[in-house]
């Protein structure tokens, strides 16, 4: 049997880039909670004891940017200079301007357009991916790397491993078999964890705790054997971390946010963007389409692409590839997708409830993945949703409720992934049952 190795990585919520993603999505949540029509393009950067929030925001919301920065940093665990940043005493810089009027009139007509007529906020192409190798319909290498990172945070915050600090990275290499286009995991080849720690713990203690409290609960025993390689803090020392160790910037972990290198990526980041930005809403709707294809039994693995022009509601193209695993021809799957989903941005916002903020909804996506990191029960996967989705940018915002901020809705997306999360705020993870007739044997 011919096999191959494939690797995916993840980073913790205390990684400086993920810190910035979470702040940007916390700002988005705050704007949408008070004003669902907020137009948000929020960037964040950070270095030693300094955070800068900048970008273009047009909103009726009253947003205390400094308060959001301090709270987000504190919640992650950056509470002193020793761990990489002092949330309560760090310097906060704010440089926010309004959205360009040229963009505003072209996309939403200064809020005068109907949802179905709202144009895409920019040009671009987005990809959705799904595979039947895990219950989440996500790649196993990505799922394991992401869950290891989330577990590191859990055992740090609950006191199981008090020597842990917020920053950290994980990486998992899986040995796969290609079953006529479908990916079949055979075993875990290598596990790599590099985690920030205090100055008192020994390398032996780190390795023992990571194996017992992080790896063992996350990686199923069936994937581990005597040949599995473990690299646990291989550099030997990781005391200095967070923004003190490296500068952070929003939007630099786009592969971690999606599929761990599987499928494809159009290049656009998610965090800090309202649903008129198709980098985010377009990627969410094609994930739902791809996931629905696999969950409905149309294919074992597939990728869906959509593309847009700025100011134009209708997508320029929609593409489906089942990697040879489709039960019917790809052209027929594509036709089902076009008949079932509405790719207009305004309708995506409605159908996926993407204008609803608050309660950390988008903040949840900003760490540990936007897709596929929690098993969704069959009753949720198969529940009946609207018969047709609209992919025009303005309608995406309405259909996915992407204008709703507040309560950390978008902040949730900024760490640990935007896809595959078992959370009612992740509306793009609900599978649509697709109607099709199985060919006669």
From Swiss-Prot:
Q: Which GO terms describe its cellular component?
A: cytoplasm
Query: According to the record, how does the cofactor bind?
Result: Binds 2 divalent ions per subunit. The metal ions interact primarily with the substrate. Can utilize magnesium, manganese or cobalt (in vitro).
Which InterPro entries would you find in this protein's record?
Answer: ADOMET_SYNTHASE_CS, S-AdoMet_synt_C, S-AdoMet_synt_central, S-AdoMet_synt_N, S-AdoMet_synthetase, S-AdoMet_synthetase_sfam
For this UniProt record, the keywords arranged alphabetically read as follows:
ATP-binding, Cobalt, Cytoplasm, Magnesium, Metal-binding, Nucleotide-binding, One-carbon metabolism, Potassium, Transferase
Mainly localized where? cytoplasm
An example Gene Ontology biological process: S-adenosylmethionine biosynthetic process
Under catalytic activity, the entry for this protein gives: L-methionine + ATP + H2O = S-adenosyl-L-methionine + phosphate + diphosphate
Residues involved in L-methionine binding: 56, 99, 246, 277
Q: Tell me the route in metabolism or biology where this protein functions.
A: Amino-acid biosynthesis; S-adenosyl-L-methionine biosynthesis; S-adenosyl-L-methionine from L-methionine: step 1/1
Name the top EC class: transferase
State its cofactor: Mn(2+); Mg(2+); Co(2+); K(+)
List the EC numbers from the record. 2.5.1.6
Where is this gene product found? Cytoplasm
Residue sites binding ATP per the record: 15, 167-169, 235-238, 246, 252-253, 269, 273, 277
Q: Name one GO molecular function term.
A: methionine adenosyltransferase activity
Residues that bind K(+): 43
Name the HAMAP family on file: S_AdoMet_synth1
Q: What does this protein do?
A: Catalyzes the formation of S-adenosylmethionine from methionine and ATP. The reaction comprises two steps that are both catalyzed by the same enzyme: formation of S-adenosylmethionine (AdoMet) and triphosphate, and subsequent hydrolysis of the triphosphate.
Per the similarity annotation, which family is this?
Belongs to the AdoMet synthase family.
Q: Which NCBIfam families match?
A: metK
Official protein name in the record: S-adenosylmethionine synthase 1
Organism, by scientific name, is Daucus carota
């Amino acid at each position: 049997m011919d096999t191959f190795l494939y690797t995916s990585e993840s980073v913790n919520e205390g990684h400086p880039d993920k810190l910035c993603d979470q702040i940007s999505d916390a700002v988005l949540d705050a704007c949408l909670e008070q004003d669902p029509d907020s137009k948000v393009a929020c960037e964040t950067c950070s270095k030693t004891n300094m955070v800068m929030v900048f970008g273009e925001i047009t909103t009726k919301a009253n947003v205390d940017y400094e308060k959001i920065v301090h709270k987000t940093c504190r919640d992650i665990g950056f509470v002193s200079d020793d761990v990489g940043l002092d949330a309560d005493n760090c310097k906060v810089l704010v440089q926010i301007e309004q959205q360009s009027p040229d963009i505003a009139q072209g996309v939403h007509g200064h809020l005068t357009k109907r949802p179905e007529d709202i144009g895409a906020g920019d040009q671009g192409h987005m990809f959705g991916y799904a595979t039947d190798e895990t219950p989440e319909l996500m790649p196993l290498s990505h799922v394991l790397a992401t869950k290891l990172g989330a577990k590191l945070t859990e055992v740090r915050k609950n006191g199981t491993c008090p020597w842990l600090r917020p920053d950290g990275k994980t990486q998992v290499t899986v040995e796969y078999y290609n079953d006529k286009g479908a990916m079949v995991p055979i075993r875990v080849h290598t596990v790599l964890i590099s985690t920030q720690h205090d100055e008192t713990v020994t390398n032996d203690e780190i390795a023992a705790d990571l194996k017992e409290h992080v790896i063992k609960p996350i990686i199923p025993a069936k994937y581990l054997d005597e040949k599995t390689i473990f690299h646990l803090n291989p550099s030997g020392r990781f005391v200095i971390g967070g923004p003190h160790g490296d500068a952070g910037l929003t939007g630099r972990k786009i592969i971690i946010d999606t599929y761990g290198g599987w499928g494809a990526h159009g290049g656009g980041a998610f965090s800090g963007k309202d649903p008129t930005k198709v980098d985010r809403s377009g990627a969410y709707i094609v994930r739902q389409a791809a996931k629905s294809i696999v969950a409905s039994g149309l294919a074992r693995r597939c990728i869906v692409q959509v593309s847009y022009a700025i100011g134009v509601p209708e997508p320029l193209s929609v593409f489906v590839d089942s990697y040879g695993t489709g039960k019917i021809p790809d052209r027929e799957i594509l036709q089902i997708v076009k008949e079932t989903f509405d790719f207009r941005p305004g309708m995506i916002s409605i159908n996926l409830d993407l204008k609803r903020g608050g309660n950390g909804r988008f903040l949840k996506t900003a760490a540990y993945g936007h897709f596929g990191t929690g098993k969704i029960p069959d009753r949720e996967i198969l529940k009946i949703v609207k018969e047709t989705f609209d992919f025009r940018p303005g309608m995406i915002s309405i259909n996915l409720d992407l204008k709703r901020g507040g309560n950390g809705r978008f902040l949730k997306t900024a760490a640990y992934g935007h896809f595959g999360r078992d959370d009612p705020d992740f509306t793009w993870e609900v599978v649509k049952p697709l109607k099709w007739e199985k060919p006669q044997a």
